[in-house]
């Protein structure tokens, strides 16, 4: 793997983040699970940690930058070892792993409980968060695969 994988991972991560942002826009536009607002929960947690107000753009920017860089780079490094013969299949595996981390670690840290069950909304938040992660990771995988033909097949 040459040094070009970094830029390819960043481009794929950017595309995945853009797809995720579109899904979140549609969630808001169509009023899906209005009581499940993970970015507002993150904003509140950041405000609590810093002891001040946090602008609503901050959690969105952190998520977008994280998806475009850190997660994209992680995906680029583990891509050859992920199961599957396509970028989409590898993206699904990466997304399910990310969803498990979000459900078992991130949501509880935000005070939402395991898989956001503390919101008393049933399995809706868990399923939507799975859709969030799969939207990101499948696009990430497809774009990364297109930019790296023959790698990890």
Predicted regions and their residues:
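Juxtamembrane/disordered regions of integral membrane proteins
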Residues: 1-153
């Amino acid at each position: 793997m040459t040094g070009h994988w970094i830029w390819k991972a960043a481009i794929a991560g950017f595309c995945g983040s853009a797809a995720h942002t579109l899904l979140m826009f549609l969630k808001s536009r169509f009023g899906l699970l209005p009581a499940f607002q993970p970015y507002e929960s993150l904003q509140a947690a950041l405000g609590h940690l810093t002891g001040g107000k946090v602008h609503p753009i901050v959690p969105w920017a952190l998520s977008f930058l994280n998806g475009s860089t850190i997660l994209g780079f992680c995906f680029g490094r583990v891509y050859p070892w992920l199961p599957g013969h396509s970028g989409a299949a590898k993206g699904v595996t990466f997304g399910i792993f990310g969803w498990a981390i979000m459900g078992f670690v991130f949501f509880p840290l935000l005070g939402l409980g395991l898989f956001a069950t503390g919101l008393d909304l049933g399995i809706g938040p868990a399923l939507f968060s799975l859709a969030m992660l799969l939207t990101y990771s499948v696009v990430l995988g497809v774009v990364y695969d297109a930019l790296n033909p023959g790698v990890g097949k």
